């Protein structure tokens, strides 16, 4: 029966991919509440929902993984799609407000990127963005979104490879049942 038992962390909260998604949600929540007009701008709800969707789909995919590798994969892809949408909203804001999108050679990008890479604590981000301008917050959000996307692409690739090697839950259960029947019933 060991085929069915998979080693997983005790909680999704210990996963870097979840922790970074929580940071993205908190940065986005701060940004829309401080720089967008909630009563006139539909982007507020769309950005918050995209950030929330990423985080919640990671949670649901992790929880569903025990019963369905297909659900885990599908929800991870949805989380990635939500982040791509959110990334475009931040880029649109910067472009439409004539603000700079930091390239990889921009001094602020060079300073922020390695810090964002090592921090997955949303409290750290809340402290870092307090009092910053919209351009800085958007670019910090873009950095952590790109880092999260890199993790999600890697995770989805891992899930695809795992499926090719092990099959889905139904295949694993069927194989385990056949092994049990062979060992216990002789056929």
Predicted feature locations:
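Amphipathic alpha-helical assembly/interaction segments
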Residues: 1-187
């Amino acid at each position: 029966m060991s085929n069915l038992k998979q080693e997983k962390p005790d909680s999704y909260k210990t996963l870097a991919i979840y922790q970074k998604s929580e940071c993205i949600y908190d940065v986005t929540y701060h940004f829309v509440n401080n720089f967008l007009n909630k009563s006139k701008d539909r982007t507020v709800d769309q950005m918050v929902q995209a950030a929330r969707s990423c985080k919640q789909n990671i949670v649901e995919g992790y929880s569903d993984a025990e019963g369905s590798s297909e659900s885990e994969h599908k929800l991870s892809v949805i989380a990635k799609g939500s982040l791509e949408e959110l990334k475009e909203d931040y880029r649109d804001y910067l472009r439409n407000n004539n603000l700079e999108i930091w390239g990889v050679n921009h001094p602020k990008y060079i300073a922020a990127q390695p810090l964002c890479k090592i921090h997955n604590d949303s409290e750290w981000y809340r402290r870092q963005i307090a009092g910053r301008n919209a351009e800085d917050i958007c670019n910090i959000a873009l950095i952590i979104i790109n880092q999260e996307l890199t993790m999600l692409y890697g995770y989805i690739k891992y899930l695809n490879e795992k499926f090719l090697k092990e099959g889905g839950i139904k295949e694993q259960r069927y194989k385990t049942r056949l092994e049990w029947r062979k060992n216990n019933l002789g056929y």
